Amino acid sequence: MLIVYFSSATDNTHRFVQKLDLPNVRIPLTRVEEPLKINEPYVLITPTYGGGVSMTGENSRPVPPQVIRFLNDEHNRSFIRAVVAGGNSNFGSDFGLAGEIISKKCKVPYVYRFELMGNEEDVSILRGGLTQNAQALGLEPQEPVTSR
């Protein structure tokens, strides 16, 4: 089971993913880095950007541009099996909005959302849910690995 994730320079999503103790690979932060190519089914974990704009009426771009670029590659998109989103519950209905958008566009389940860098309960729920439902999601079941 592979986790593909994006994390901004704050590393909140990175910290959460490392606590999952599952194989993972990070979508590059900058265009200078080599683009990521995925060749197996994966769960995408992404933060949500621009939280709270629905309350102000501004235009929202909740999916990070790096994630959009990654998913615009049809090959990468063909292997996505589920999406998880991070965010901030202070932003009301925008909390985890990136997950909703990706789920609809890629026609995959939006399986979980967590706040900021998640807590131990989030880690336990998501890890357990992914492990128990790996086959149903089209993922290869796998035992946790030691974090890198």
UniProtKB/Swiss-Prot annotation:
The lineage of its organism: Bacteria, Bacillati, Actinomycetota, Actinomycetes, Mycobacteriales. NCBIfam families: nrdI. Transmembrane segments: none annotated. Probably involved in ribonucleotide reductase function. HAMAP family: NrdI. GO terms for molecular function: FMN binding. The gene is nrdI. It comes from Corynebacterium glutamicum (strain ATCC 13032 / DSM 20300 / JCM 1318 / BCRC 11384 / CCUG 27702 / LMG 3730 / NBRC 12168 / NCIMB 10025 / NRRL B-2784 / 534). PANTHER family: PROTEIN NRDI. It comes from the Bacteria. Belongs to the NrdI family. This is Protein NrdI. GO terms for biological process: protein modification process.
